[in-house]
Amino acid sequence: MTGLFQLVSSYSPSGDQPTAVQKLVTNFHAGIAKQVLLGVTGSGKTYTIANVVEQIQKPTLVMAPNKTLAAQLYGEFKAFFPHNAVEYFVSYYDYYQPEAYVPASDTFIEKDSSINEYIEQMRLAATKALLSRSDVLVVATVSAIYGLGAPEDYLSLRLILSLGEHIEQRQLIRHLTELQYTRNELDLVRGSFRVRGEVVDVFPAESEMEALRIELFDGEIESLSLFDPLTGQTVRKLQRYSVYPKTHYATTRERTLSAVDTIKDELKEYLELLYGRNKLVEAQRLAQRTQFDLEMMAEVGYCNGIENYSRHLTGKAPGEPPPTLFDYLPPDALLVIDESHVTIPQIGAMFKGDRSRKETLVEFGFRLPSALDNRPLRFEEWEVRSPRSIYVSATPGSYEFRESAGEVIELLVRPTGLIDPEIEIRPVATQVDDLISQINVCIKLGDRVLVTTLTKRMAENLTEYLSEQGIRIRYLHSEIDTVERVEIIRDLRLGKFDVLVGINLLREGLDMPEVSLVAILDADKEGFLRSTSSLIQTIGRAARSVRGRAILYADKVTRSMRAAIDETERRRQKQKEYNAENGIVPKSVVRPISDILEGARDGVEVKSKGKGRRVDEVPADYCALNQAEIAAQMKVLEQQMYQHARDLEFEDAARIRDQIQRLREAGLG
């Protein structure tokens, strides 16, 4: 089924938004390849893009710099387009250790990974939607530039079923097996099928809640229907249905056997090269490992690390780029690069890191040279494959400005009337004492403070010193994982502490209305953390509060500081003019803390993908439980925690993790 994008929202574009939407849409239809949407924090960039998508009515790919921001965007677009296909495409690895070889210590590290089945299902749903409908918006990370199966193979393998079609049951089962579906009569799970008389039930790999029931009679499809695999209740009847492969890497038996032959040819050629260089150990190692893989592929059609032979399986020439998610996009699609100042450099860096590791594996006989072609796209290859694009950022980089050739659409006015923070410059010599006095002023007002330093050591020392002065303070550093990071931000908003110190506080998720002061220590030390874009991004962290201020501690005004101050002042003036013209009185953004922490109340109802589960708080009196009861309670909570993590509900996962820790402590006590 395909339809039109229908934006659902309780408000309409205001401020700079109507003009921005009109310009972006007009330029898109005029064939302009690259545009920049320069939007300040809180100006409604996501809502603006949603309006553009509704007006141009083209399949859209939104790229974000990390999984956390991608999850936030996915949730927002899902709310804007509830009747359309909004999909999520990120790396499906919860944990990934690529295979590697360290020549200095003669250490080979085997590939080790843990795949998140829920995200794998969402990836499959994304590619199916791109191939089968036009009203599709996919939110992705740089995972989109990594190799996938070829779309033509993916399409040619699909099983198209129609009511009244003649198909023998054996033929149907054989086709499902070619799609890598497994037969399971006991438990119908994703990617499996079962046979009961003349009824074949299939749980599509990309489906979250519904399975397919195929009822045959005398070699003819008598009925097609979707049903709930848990209750067996029919959801709706169908006239037609397409079953897509269980994995993006599925291929035909003929293609696999053909690949085996070409791999043998490459092996023979490379072994001769190794023997010629007198690399006997490497040659023996390569022959043994590759021969084992070839036997597995010939017998079962698959082997561990089969992605290293993807060039042979797709029939590509040496050095040719692999098929990626961009090959699934139609030519007239729209590409949106969110936080482009971060995402663009990421895309350029992916290829080089992957290449250096694999070159070592090839050199020492762990892989054939064709493994080098299992790679992400080079930056220039990505540019060629990119459709018409919009770069979205508060601080676009030089690449975006150059590529857009002056097509920069500004989104500087916030509908809330909030003005960019006031900026003050104060001397470095007294920065710590002055900071303490400023923190105390904010605490009296019930506000929070963000402090950014240049090094980890400075952050640790400052945190320790301020803590000794009686200030409730926490330190955010790179070793903290996503869930714990969200928990720290939540605790700051809840007032469990007042000051958050970090090195690079530019990352998403730090837009908190409670923060009225951002302090930047050593602001005059030029470098990555004190560049113009970094300063603007950091200053913007206080842009959600009506009392927002930024203090730059510096003894001189650098070029980056001057540019950041001038740009912020320009934005302040434009917002003031808009407020005066429209009679708007700025008010701080009111964002309920329950939005961040559903678990602040007992017995919270959790919206988990329509499953309607209820997650209850654990009893406070843990000491009343015996060891067996504590162990049982911990097991139940762990299952709930992992489910929340799979559903991208990191705040709830963090809350339950805390409960498990308290239970563990009670058990030890």
Curated annotation (Swiss-Prot):
Taxonomy, superkingdom: Bacteria
UVR domain ranges (all copies): 631-666
Domain called Helicase C-terminal: residue spans: 435-597
Gene name of the record: uvrB
Positions with a binding annotation for ATP: G39, V40, T41, G42, S43, G44, K45, T46
Motif Beta-hairpin, residue numbers: 92-115
Record-stated family: Belongs to the UvrB family.
Protein purpose: The UvrABC repair system catalyzes the recognition and processing of DNA lesions. A damage recognition complex composed of 2 UvrA and 2 UvrB subunits scans DNA for abnormalities. Upon binding of the UvrA(2)B(2) complex to a putative damaged site, the DNA wraps around one UvrB monomer. DNA wrap is dependent on ATP binding by UvrB and probably causes local melting of the DNA helix, facilitating insertion of UvrB beta-hairpin between the DNA strands. Then UvrB probes one DNA strand for the presence of a lesion.
SMART domains the record matches: DEXDc, HELICc
HAMAP family per record: UvrB (MF_00204)
Keywords of the record: ATP-binding, Cytoplasm, DNA damage, DNA excision, DNA repair, Excision nuclease, Nucleotide-binding, SOS response
Organism encoding this protein: Xylella fastidiosa (strain 9a5c)
GO biological process per UniProt: nucleotide-excision repair; SOS response
Membrane-spanning segments: none
UniProt keyword Nucleotide-binding, yes or no: yes
Gene Ontology molecular function, alphabetical: ATP binding; ATP hydrolysis activity; DNA binding; excinuclease ABC activity
Predominant subcellular localization, coarse grouping: cytoplasm
Domain Helicase ATP-binding: 26-414
CDD domains: DEXHc_UvrB, SF2_C_UvrB
Protein location: Cytoplasm
Known partners and oligomeric status: Forms a heterotetramer with UvrA during the search for lesions. Interacts with UvrC in an incision complex.
PROSITE patterns to which the protein is assigned, alphabetical: HELICASE_ATP_BIND_1, HELICASE_CTER, UVR
Annotated InterPro entries: Helicase/UvrB_N (IPR006935), Helicase_ATP-bd (IPR014001), Helicase_C-like (IPR001650), P-loop_NTPase (IPR027417), UVR_dom (IPR001943), UVR_dom_sf (IPR036876), UvrB (IPR004807), UvrB_inter (IPR041471)
UniProt protein name: UvrABC system protein B
GO CC term (a single one): cytoplasm
Comment field on protein domains: The beta-hairpin motif is involved in DNA binding.
